[in-house]
């Protein structure tokens, strides 16, 4: 097939997108596909025309215009199939303040939060206690994520977010271990337990620096806990109207309470990223995972 590989974009996660796309291109070529790159930052105006002349689009964008559903809407207009969720599910999952309301309404635990659409007054306090996390409301890769332990650290953390993003979300730090779990088709994958370097948390540096974190797959958790993580992951995937694949990130507290932090509709796709690790645990190497995502995308488009 003629595959349009969409990567780059204009978000702060551009470099992550391009790095992952190189591995995807290699896998697509190994599968026998003819690959053409398209970078929305260069010419978003040309996407409809490019998509119309290709059999499939593989999206590897992080942040806007991929995770917010814009590219998916344009591909739908062009009649070009693609992997993953459609415009509505993509937008809903990317917006943490909105998706958290939906998840909580349906009984899924998520940390309390304060949402900010603009810089607050200098003396503003979220009333969530310390430590807490400050992060963009619509963003990934843990960019601009700050852990704040004292009130005097709140204003600089918020400024770091608003320097790059229009909205912020503040959450209390939940003590526990970090767990992530992917969905492929209608199946929850084996969860991963993440152990950041001592004294750190799973921020951008930990994610993309060798040795920044230890990722244990499958997670060394009791069978009933693993089953619970997978069940909640599938529920969240369906509640948000997602399809194809996704990845949910959690904090698992010592008492067994599982707090869903966010759901990613275009999770990292380097061969060593989290979802590819989970797929490998069930016998799917990276090219096989890419092939499965294409198959799911074609099926969703009725092809």
UniProtKB/Swiss-Prot annotation:
EC number(s) recorded for this UniProt protein: 6.3.2.4
Cellular component annotations (GO), alphabetically ordered: cytoplasm
Location(s) in or outside the cell: Cytoplasm
Chief localisation class: cytoplasm
Annotated binding of ATP, by residue: 127-180
Function: Cell wall formation.
Name of this chain's protein: D-alanine--D-alanine ligase
Species this protein is from: Nitratidesulfovibrio vulgaris (strain ATCC 29579 / DSM 644 / CCUG 34227 / NCIMB 8303 / VKM B-1760 / Hildenborough) (Desulfovibrio vulgaris)
The encoding gene: ddl
């Amino acid at each position: 097939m003629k595959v349009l590989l969409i990567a780059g974009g204009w978000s702060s996660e551009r470099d992550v997108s391009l790095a992952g796309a190189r591995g995807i291109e290699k896998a697509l070529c190994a599968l026998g596909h003819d690959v053409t790159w398209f970078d929305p930052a260069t010419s978003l105006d040309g996407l409809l025309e490019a998509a119309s002349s290709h059999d499939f689009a593989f999206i590897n964008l992080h942040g806007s215009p991929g995770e917010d559903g814009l590219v998916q809407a344009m591909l739908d207009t062009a009649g070009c199939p693609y992997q993953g969720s459609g415009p509505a599910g993509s937008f809903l999952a990317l917006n943490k303040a909105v998706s958290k309301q939906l998840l909580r309404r349906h009984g899924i635990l998520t940390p309390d939060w304060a949402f900010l659409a603009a810089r607050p007054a200098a003396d503003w306090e979220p009333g969530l206690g310390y430590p807490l996390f400050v992060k963009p409301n619509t963003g990934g890769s843990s960019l601009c994520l700050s852990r704040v332990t004292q009130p005097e650290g709140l204003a600089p953390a918020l400024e770091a977010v608003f320097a790059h993003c229009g909205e912020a979300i503040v959450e209390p730090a939940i003590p526990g271990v970090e767990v992530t779990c992917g969905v492929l088709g209608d199946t929850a994958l084996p969860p991963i337990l993440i152990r950041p370097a001592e004294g750190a948390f799973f921020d951008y540096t930990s994610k993309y620096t060798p040795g920044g974190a230890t990722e244990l797959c499958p997670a060394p958790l009791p069978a009933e806990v693993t089953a619970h993580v997978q069940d909640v992951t599938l529920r969240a995937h369906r509640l948000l109207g997602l399809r194809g694949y996704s990845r949910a990130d959690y904090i698992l507290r010592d008492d067994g309470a599982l707090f869903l932090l966010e759901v990613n509709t275009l999770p990292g796709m380097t061969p060593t990223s989290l979802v590819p690790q989970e797929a490998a645990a069930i016998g799917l190497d990276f090219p096989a995972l890419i092939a499965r995502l294409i198959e799911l995308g074609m099926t969703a488009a009725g092809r």
